[in-house]
Structures are given as C-alpha cells and as structure tokens.
Amino acid sequence: MAAEPPADGRDPPADDGAAGDGAVESAAAEALLSAASEQLTLVYQGEVYVFDPVPPQKVQAVLLVLGGSDMPPGLVSMAVPTTFDEKSTTVAARRIASLMRFREKRKERCFDKKIRYSVRKEVAQKMKRRKGQFAGRADFGDGSCSSAPCGSTANGEDDHIRETHCQNCGISSRLTPAMRRGPAGPRSLCNACGLMWANKGTLRSPLNAPKMTVQHPADLSKTGDTDDSKANLCAEHNQTTMKTDTEMVPEQEQKADVLPPTKEEDSMATS
C-alpha cells in the first residue's frame, strides 16, 4: 500500500542520501558565489572555511582535482571581462607612455641643414694651392698663407726654387708631367721612370731617356732675335721676287704682241 501523506500536509523527511546530495550542492553553490567576489567559502560538515582572496582559476583547478565538473559558464563570463579590461588598460597605458617618449625625443631633433657654406668658402680660400688644386703641407712646408693670391705667388717661387731632377735619367722636373715615387722616396723619379718602377719594379736605362735641355730667358731672347731676323730676310726675299716678276711682265707682253706672219702675208711678200 502506498504511504498516506501526513495530516498536516508537510512532506515526509527525506532519506540520508538525498540530504547529503543537497548539502553538497548548496556548498558548491556557496563556493562559486563567493569565488565570484574573489572570496572562497567552503562549508563542510557544518564548518565554514573562508579563503580570501582566491582567483577563479584556482577554484576551477580544485574542482577538477576533486573530480567535479568545470566551472559554470556564467562564472567564467563574469571573471574574464575583468582580466580583459586589465590587459586593455595596461596596453593603452603603455602606448600612451611610448607616445609621450616619442614626442619628447622629436622635440630634441633638428632637421635643418647645418652646412655653413660661408665657413667652407673661407677655409677653401685659406688653403694652399698648386696649379689651381689644393696642396698638402709636404709640398710647401709648415708656412701658412691667408689669401689665394699670396698662395699663388708662393707657389711660383717654390716651383722655381724646388726644381728637382730624376735620379735615374737626370731629367728636370719642369720637363716631365709629374715627379713620381722611386726607391729613394717620393718625387725622386720622372714620370717615365716612375711608371716603369711602379709597374715592373725595375729602372729603365738612362741611355733611352730623351735628352732635353732647359732654355733660359737669355736663350729665349736670342732665339727670338734669330726668328725676327729670319722673318725679315724672308720678307725681303719675297719683295725682290715680286719686283723681278713685275719687271718681267712687260717683256712678256711685248713678246705676246709680236705674232708670226700668216701664209697669205708670206705669199704677198714673195709676189
């Protein structure tokens, strides 16, 4: 027979097993609710255990170790936005800080051209020149000159004073394009000997060197006088030839006027 319900209308007391399951479920619910506020509260056999603070990840790990199920999706959705918000705020703060540092560095930068051409022009005018090109200290010593004209006059004097000769063939530095390095040091060989020494490592025989002499100003004046005298002689010779030509022209014209007699004139003369 089925058991009749009590007269007061109350439900009969549940079994011990059903009561135990209800207690476990209530304890788990309380633990989850407290975990949402980062405070874990456990009720076991009438005793309450409170752990503060405990993150939701640790609660889920404990439930997995105890053999329970994963955390409810509602609790996870409640906990994830907080962490996402923290990450977004940290990223935004870092970006703002880096942007501020970049702006501070940009203020210190200067993109203007700092080339001062006037200063460069003054330096170029003070530098020594040789044949229109910049020359080093080795060519002119340690002396300094403050202007380009002064440098040009000094160059002429130095070229006249520091005339050197090739140590191999004896040719002057004025008769070669450039003096080159040799076994005795720089500017010790002429252009031809220096090139042969640089390419083949040997010196050419002095017999093959061209014999060229330097013409001094006095010699140049003498040669100029001789050239003038030759030019005068040529002019006089041309004038005499022109005179002879003019004198010979009338005689040729007279000869041209005298023509040989024709056959008719000869026949009339004979008759």
From Swiss-Prot:
CCT domain sequence ranges: 95-137
Compartments, record wording: Nucleus
Predominant localisation class: nucleus
Signal peptide coordinates: none
InterPro entries found in the cross-reference section: CCT_domain, TIFY-like, Tify_dom, Znf_GATA, Znf_NHR/GATA
MF GO annotations: sequence-specific DNA binding; zinc ion binding
GO CC terms of this entry: nucleus
GO biological process: regulation of DNA-templated transcription
Keywords: Activator, DNA-binding, Metal-binding, Nucleus, Transcription, Transcription regulation, Zinc, Zinc-finger
Domain Tify: 33-68
Biological role: Transcriptional activator that specifically binds 5'-GATA-3' or 5'-GAT-3' motifs within gene promoters.
Name of this protein: GATA transcription factor 19
Naturally occurring in which organism (per UniProt): Oryza sativa subsp. indica
